[in-house]
């Protein structure tokens, strides 16, 4: 049975095997033909044959290379915006023919307000180069009779959209007289529109001529001022030097008064004779130093005049020389003040017994000066303090103040602030009061030391 079935099936198997072999052979032939065709074929790029690389069939399928297509935009022709603007003659005069408007336009630079004005006038934007030229050629809106109302309404809307400051700027450029503080925005828009419909000169005064006149006046005044300053400079500097000398002279006079009072008080005492000699020597020294300072200032003034005439040195060097001379004179007078105050303090500290008698005799002298002080106080409307009041306040100030840093001017300021009166004219009297107060304070300290020593001795005895 098995042999019979095999014999029956063999013709069918043979038929199927033959069909499969034919299919494989046809496939191989087709692939070989394709490979040969691809090798022979070439892609033409720019007139040249380019053979694509051949890869074996077993690895990957073959792909045809595609040609790159570039996307190019056709540029349209340039718009007509670069064409010159056609300006037709309006109802009024051209803005460049109105002198004030032309003058203001010449002073202005292209800015946002001018660009906005150009768009309102012509409905188009303009380049910065042609901006002022186009505005100057404007002579009024050109509207047809049929569309006049519509065009006027459009122009009014454009002006209403602008800020008040811009409308004021338009009025300034177009020389429209306006009260900036009280005018309203609506009124500004109406005035600008009326002017632009028919531009005309608003006033007869020419701004260019008025500004030229003002410039001429300024130049003439500046020349006069410079000439006046050049002629009066030495006189001014002399005045300044004199002013600097005045306070030093007053200080010297105060010191001389102190010296004279000291001499009058010491007539009845034999011990005070050397004080008089010292005070006289101090006065002579101060006078000599004043004379030297005056001679220095005079010499500096002569040098300045000679330098001005010859024009050898600049003004800066002159000012330096003035400042140097003034500073030197101030330093010299300050040194004199310090030396006099220190010497007077030492002399009066050594002579404690005579200080009490001086206090009695000096009370009579301020009464003579009191008449002058009362005259000044009557003019000012305030009563000046007496010597006793000054003495009390000075002692309080001296207890609070450091002797190393405090000066006479500081004490005078504190006294003035306390009494509400300027006491610079009583400088010499205040100086005497200060010395008396210092002596009293030193006496009190000595008495305290003696009391403490006595108490210590008593305790030691006990």
From Swiss-Prot:
Residues 402-416, 431-435 bind DNA. It comes from the Eukaryota. Residues 20-32, 277-303, 312-322, 347-360 have a biased composition (Basic and acidic residues). It is found in: Nucleus; Nucleus, Nucleolus. Residues 77-91 have a biased composition (Polar residues). SUPFAM superfamilies: DEK C-terminal domain. A motif (Nuclear localization signal) lies at residues 344-351. GO terms for molecular function: chromatin binding; DNA binding; histone binding. Residues 33-46, 267-276, 441-462 have a biased composition (Acidic residues). Pfam families: DEK_C. Residues 384-439 form the DEK-C domain. One of its GO terms (cellular component) is nucleus. Residues 18-91, 212-390, 438-462 are annotated as: Disordered. GO terms for biological process: chromatin remodeling; negative regulation of DNA-templated transcription; regulation of DNA-templated transcription. InterPro entries: DEK (IPR044198), DEK_C (IPR014876). Keywords: Chromatin regulator, DNA-binding, Nucleus, Transcription, Transcription regulation. Chromatin-associated protein which contributes to the modulation of chromatin structure (such as super-helical structure of DNA) and function. Binds to chromatin of protein-coding genes throughout the genome to regulate nucleosome occupancy and chromatin accessibility, and to modulate the expression of target genes. Found in a mRNA splicing-dependent exon junction complex (EJC). Binds specifically histones H3 and H4. This is DEK domain-containing chromatin-associated protein 1. It comes from Arabidopsis thaliana (Mouse-ear cress). The lineage of its organism: Eukaryota, Viridiplantae, Streptophyta, Embryophyta, Tracheophyta. The gene is DEK1.
């Amino acid at each position: 049975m098995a042999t019979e079935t095999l014999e029956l099936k063999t013709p069918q198997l043979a038929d199927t095997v033959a069909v499969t072999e034919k299919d494989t052979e046809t496939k191989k032939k087709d692939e070989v033909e394709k490979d040969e065709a691809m090798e022979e074929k070439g892609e033409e790029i720019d007139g040249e044959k380019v053979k694509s690389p051949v890869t074996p069939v077993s690895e990957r399928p073959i792909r045809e290379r595609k040609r790159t297509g570039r996307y190019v935009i056709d540029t349209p022709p340039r718009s007509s915006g670069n064409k010159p603007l056609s300006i037709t003659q309006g109802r009024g005069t051209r803005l460049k023919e109105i002198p004030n408007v032309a003058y203001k336009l010449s002073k202005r630079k292209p800015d946002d307000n001018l660009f906005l004005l150009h768009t309102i006038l012509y409905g188009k934007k303009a380049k910065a180069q042609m901006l002022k030229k186009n505005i100057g050629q404007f002579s009024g809106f050109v509207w047809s009779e049929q569309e006049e109302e519509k065009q006027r309404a459009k122009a009014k809307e454009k002006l209403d959209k602008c800020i008040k400051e811009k409308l004021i700027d338009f009025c300034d450029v177009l020389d429209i007289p306006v009260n900036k503080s009280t005018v309203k925005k609506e009124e500004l828009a109406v005035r600008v529109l009326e002017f632009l419909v028919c531009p005309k000169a608003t006033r007869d005064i020419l701004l260019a001529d008025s500004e030229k006149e003002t410039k001429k006046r300024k130049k003439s005044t500046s020349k006069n001022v410079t000439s006046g300053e050049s002629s009066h400079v030495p006189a001014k500097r002399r005045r300044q030097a004199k002013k600097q000398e005045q306070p030093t002279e007053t200080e010297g006079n105060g010191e001389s008064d102190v010296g004279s009072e000291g001499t009058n008080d010491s007539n009845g005492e034999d011990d005070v004779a050397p004080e008089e000699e010292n005070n006289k020597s101090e006065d002579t020294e101060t006078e000599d130093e004043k004379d030297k300072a005056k001679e220095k200032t005079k010499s500096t003034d002569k040098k300045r005049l000679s330098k001005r005439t010859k024009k050898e040195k600049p003004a800066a060097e002159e000012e330096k020389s003035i400042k140097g001379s003034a500073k030197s004179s101030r330093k010299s007078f300050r040194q004199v003040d310090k030396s006099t105050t220190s010497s007077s303090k030492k002399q009066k500290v050594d002579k404690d017994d005579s200080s009490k008698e001086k206090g009695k005799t000096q009370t009579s002298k301020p009464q003579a000066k009191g008449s002058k002080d009362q005259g000044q106080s009557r003019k000012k409307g305030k009563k000046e303090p007496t010597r006793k009041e000054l003495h009390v306040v000075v002692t309080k100030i001296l207890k609070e103040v450091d002797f190393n840093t405090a000066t006479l001017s500081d004490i005078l300021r504190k006294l003035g602030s306390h009494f509400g009166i300027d006491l610079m004219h009583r400088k010499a009297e205040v100086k005497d009061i200060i010395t008396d107060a210092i002596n009293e304070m030193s006496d009190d300290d000595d008495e305290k030391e003696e009391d403490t020593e006595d108490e210590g001795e008593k305790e030691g005895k006990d």
